[in-house]
């Protein structure tokens, strides 16, 4: 029977939680040993509303280094809390409401925090398991799941029953060895990559997938060391695709082999983009669990009608310094989703734990980012804009999202001395907590090495709405707007209230900061 598995013991893999049986993970251990006591404060302790660890027992504070992010993450890994008392939990994995799925089960799944895809355990389609050899057969019909990607703004759903994806009816091939991937791509319409290890300098190349193909990651996908900034570990292209994972899978980017606190700004060579989606059309990427990527995670470019949903990105292992990072967090430039030159894209219902932009859009049109949970990074960003082959962003909505324990909340950044256009941007219903630098920031003096303090006006920024953006700062400025001469126009603020910062500065609009 095909079923939706929603069991709490699976959370450590789904969220890349620490092993409570490992003595090195004292925070996870105390939650496991004293789960009842933990549940009593986890019911109300969420990073979306807590900026100080008040009410947390001393033993938990000691084991978790008094860090809100560690406490909150461990609460998430503990499992579901009482819905009668809990505040809203981070965004969870859900299929877009407009995307039909195939189901053969009449069982009702119990809602949980991490609903996940479970591939078919039996099928009338041919099933071929192989290492380096496969049998070919005709592909089945294209997946209606993938073909139904929509540009309509999705409805936010934080926890709901989930129907597993059961394949597209064509040949299914299970790959357990890297050498078998290319043959499967050429011959199969359903491809399961099970516990695949990609050797050094070996890309998981999914650029020639059949139209309507499905790729399902199972077990643990791992990679050898490749010290090359031009190397992309996973590359995906195609039309009407479904890219997803089983309930217990994890894709591990081996970031610890590269992290040196410098990311792509220097230090050792490291893969600059972990997963590249390019020339992907009318497709769905759903329910992937990814951890420990070296630098940028998703590089999404030249796509059309693409939906990404239910994705958990966890790079929190890079928060701590290592021997190479000179006291700084080991991971750096660890953007979650970088989007460029894409049209009609939906990113929703996903969690990002990282050290840089949760989402960064540098070019594209008609993009919706909804129901995100962003922790530890640089917030929800437009930019940086300027100095690239495509420098136009038009029609972006960020909505119904939480940004916690991060450097920035809502950010628009344009490069000093460059040209481009940013228009029709909306931030609505965004909750901020523990923001250390800027709650809302628009700056036109940005450079990767540091802002110049002198804004330029080569990039126009017009028709920007901030609606119901609320929350608290742990320091820094609530608002910072630094526009070039005449380059900002028609900014509106409604229901905006950010507190806890100081020395706000806004040279636009004329009325000053909100």
Swiss-Prot record:
An example Gene Ontology biological process: pectin catabolic process
PbH1 repeats: 280-302, 303-341, 342-363, 364-384, 393-414, 422-444, 456-500
Reactions this protein catalyses: (1,4-alpha-D-galacturonosyl)n+m + H2O = (1,4-alpha-D-galacturonosyl)n + (1,4-alpha-D-galacturonosyl)m
Enzyme nomenclature, EC number: 3.2.1.15
GO cellular component, one term: extracellular region
Listed SMART domains: PbH1
Subcellular location: Secreted
Protein name: Probable endopolygalacturonase D
The species this protein was found in: Emericella nidulans (strain FGSC A4 / ATCC 38163 / CBS 112.46 / NRRL 194 / M139) (Aspergillus nidulans)
Gene assigned in the entry: pgaD
């Amino acid at each position: 029977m095909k079923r939706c598995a929603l069991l709490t013991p699976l959370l450590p893999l789904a969220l890349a939680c620490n092993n409570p049986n490992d003595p090195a993970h004292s925070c996870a251990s105390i939650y496991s040993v004293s789960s009842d006591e933990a549940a009593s404060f986890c019911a109300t302790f969420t990073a979306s509303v807590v900026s100080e660890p008040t009410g947390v027992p001393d033993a938990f504070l000691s084991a978790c280094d008094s860090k809100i992010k560690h406490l909150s993450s461990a609460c998430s890994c503990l499992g579901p809390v009482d819905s009668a008392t809990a505040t809203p939990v981070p965004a969870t994995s859900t299929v877009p409401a407009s995307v039909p799925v195939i189901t053969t089960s009449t069982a009702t799944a119990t809602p949980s925090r991490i609903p996940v895809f479970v591939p078919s355990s039996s099928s009338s389609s041919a099933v071929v398991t192989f290492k380096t050899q496969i049998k070919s057969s005709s592909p089945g019909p294209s997946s209606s799941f993938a073909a139904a990607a929509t540009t309509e703004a999705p409805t936010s759903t934080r926890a709901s029953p989930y129907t597993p994806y059961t394949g597209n009816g064509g040949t299914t091939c299970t790959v357990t060895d890297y050498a078998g991937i290319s043959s499967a791509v050429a011959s199969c319409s359903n491809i399961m990559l099970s516990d695949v290890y990609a050797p050094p300098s070996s890309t998981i190349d999914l650029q020639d997938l059949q139209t309507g193909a499905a790729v399902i990651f199972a077990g643990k996908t791992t990679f050898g060391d490749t010290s090359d900034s031009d190397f992309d570990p996973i590359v995906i292209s195609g039309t009407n695709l479904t890219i997803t994972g089983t309930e217990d899978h994890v894709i591990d980017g081996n970031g610890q082999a590269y992290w040196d606190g410098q990311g792509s700004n220097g230090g050792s060579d490291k893969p600059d983009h972990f997963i590249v989606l390019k020339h992907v059309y009318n497709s769905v990427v759903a329910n992937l669990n990814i951890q420990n990527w070296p630098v940028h995670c998703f590089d999404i470019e030249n796509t059309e009608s693409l939906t990404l949903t239910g994705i958990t990105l966890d790079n929190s292992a890079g928060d701590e310094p290592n021997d190479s990072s000179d006291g700084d967090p080991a991971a750096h430039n660890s953007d979650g989703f970088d989007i460029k030159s894409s049209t009609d894209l939906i990113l929703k219902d996903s969690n990002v734990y990282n050290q840089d932009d949760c989402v960064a859009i540098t070019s594209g049109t008609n993009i919706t980012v909804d129901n995100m949970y962003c922790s530890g990074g640089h917030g929800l960003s437009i930019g940086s804009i300027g100095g690239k082959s495509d420098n136009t962003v038009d029609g972006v909505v960020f909505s119904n999202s939480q940004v916690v324990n991060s450097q920035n909340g809502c950010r628009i950044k344009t490069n000093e001395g460059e040209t481009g256009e940013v228009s029709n941007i909306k931030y609505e219903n965004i909750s901020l907590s523990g923001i250390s630098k800027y709650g809302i920031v628009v700056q036109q003096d940005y450079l990767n090495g540091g802002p110049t303090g002198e804004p330029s006006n080569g990039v126009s920024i017009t028709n920007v709405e901030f609606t119901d953006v609320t929350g608290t700062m742990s320091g820094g400025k609530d608002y910072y707007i630094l526009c070039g001469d005449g380059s900002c126009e028609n900014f509106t603020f409604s229901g905006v209230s950010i507190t806890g910062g100081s020395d706000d500065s806004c040279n636009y609009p004329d009325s000053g900061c909100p």
